[in-house]
C-alpha cells in the first residue's frame, strides 16, 4: 500500500481517533468505568480513576498512531482497514482493550 499524503493521513488519523473516543466511551459506560477523555488536536488522553493515563496520538511523518500506556509505548501502522503494532503484529483495538482494562481495573472490550 503506497504512503498517503500528509493531509490524507491526518484525515484518516482524525477519523480513527473519533472512532476510538466513541468506542472507549461506549465500553466505559457499559462497564460503569470512570474514564475521562480529552482531545487536543491529534492527541487524545484517557485518564482513569486511579490517576493513570493512556495517551494516543497520530504521527504524520511516520504515518502511525502512537499509544503510551502503563504497559509501554506502542506504534501502530495502517494495514488495509486495520492498525497493526509495528513490533508484535497485534491489532489496535485488541491491544487497547487490554491496556484500558488493565488501567481501569475492569474488563472492557473495544472494537
Curated annotation (Swiss-Prot):
SMART domains: Frataxin_Cyay. GO terms for cellular component: cytosol. One of its GO terms (biological process) is iron-sulfur cluster assembly. The keyword Nucleotide-binding does not apply. The keyword Iron applies. It holds the Pfam family Frataxin_Cyay. PROSITE patterns: FRATAXIN_1 (PS01344), FRATAXIN_2 (PS50810). GO terms for molecular function: ferric iron binding; ferrous iron binding. Keywords: Iron, Metal-binding. Involved in iron-sulfur (Fe-S) cluster assembly. May act as a regulator of Fe-S biogenesis. Belongs to the frataxin family. PANTHER family: FRATAXIN (PTHR16821), FRATAXIN, MITOCHONDRIAL (PTHR16821:SF2). This is Iron-sulfur cluster assembly protein CyaY. It comes from Cupriavidus necator (strain ATCC 17699 / DSM 428 / KCTC 22496 / NCIMB 10442 / H16 / Stanier 337). The lineage of its organism: Bacteria, Pseudomonadati, Pseudomonadota, Betaproteobacteria, Burkholderiales. The gene is cyaY.
